[in-house]
């Protein structure tokens, strides 16, 4: 017979992040000890950037952004060409449940593959090639936080700084160049 151990002082990280966001929105202050350490640090950086956790989408790809996208893709051509086979492999393996994104060292989105219809959901309409997902612009998110931390990052639903991203869980892995610098 399997022995069951009682769970004491268990915390639900999603509940804790919801409570932290509610307190932040109502009191203007982030309570300590409610979030995982790396999420707490990222939320504090997001606050330092002056972001509102209730900020809406920033939809739109204007003419200047289109021109910038072409330059961005050309600047990152070696990275894109090098990782395309791996992106294809990941899309093939992840099935019909998500998307795979390639970003650069500044958290600019270079490519999106997979179930792109997911992007039509509220909260993700401003996620497209050429959009920047740095912590300074979007708060805690897998792409931007992995760039800052320089290590694999999991943002589980409500741990995103922006409330509108709470339905989504995201993982990001930095791609280092031969010198160990994050290149994507």
Each language-model region and where it sits:
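Short hydrophobic/glycine-rich mini-motifs in sensory/regulatory modules
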Residues: 175-184
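Intrinsically disordered, low-complexity terminal regulatory regions
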Residues: 1-134, 145, 154, 167
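A general structural signal for short secondary-structure junctions and capping/turn motifs
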Residues: 92, 145, 161-162, 177-178
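Fold-independent oxyanion-binding glycine-rich loops
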Residues: 105, 157-159, 173
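Short loop/turn segments at beta-alpha junctions that line or gate ligand-sensing/allosteric surfaces
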Residues: 135-140, 146-164
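A short beta-strand signature within small-molecule sensing/ligand-binding domains used
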Residues: 164-174
């Amino acid at each position: 017979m399997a022995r069951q151990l009682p769970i004491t002082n268990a915390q639900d990280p999603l509940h804790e992040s919801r409570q932290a966001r509610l307190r932040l929105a109502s009191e203007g202050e982030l309570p300590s000890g409610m979030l995982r350490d790396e999420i707490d640090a990222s939320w504090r950086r997001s606050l330092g950037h002056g972001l509102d956790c209730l900020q809406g989408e920033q939809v739109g790809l204007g003419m200047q952004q289109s021109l910038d996208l072409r330059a961005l893709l050309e600047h990152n051509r070696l990275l894109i060409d090098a990782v395309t086979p791996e992106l294809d492999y990941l899309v093939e393996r992840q099935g019909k449940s998500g998307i795979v994104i390639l970003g650069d060292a500044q958290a600019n989105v270079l490519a999106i593959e997979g179930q792109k219809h997911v992007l039509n959901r509220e909260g993700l309409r401003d996620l497209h090639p050429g959009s920047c997902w740095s912590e300074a612009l979007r708060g805690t998110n897998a792409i931007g936080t992995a760039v800052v931390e320089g290590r694999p990052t999991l943002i589980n639903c409500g741990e995103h700084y922006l409330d509108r991203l709470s339905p989504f869980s995201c993982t990001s892995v930095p791609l280092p160049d031969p010198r160990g610098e994050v290149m994507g």
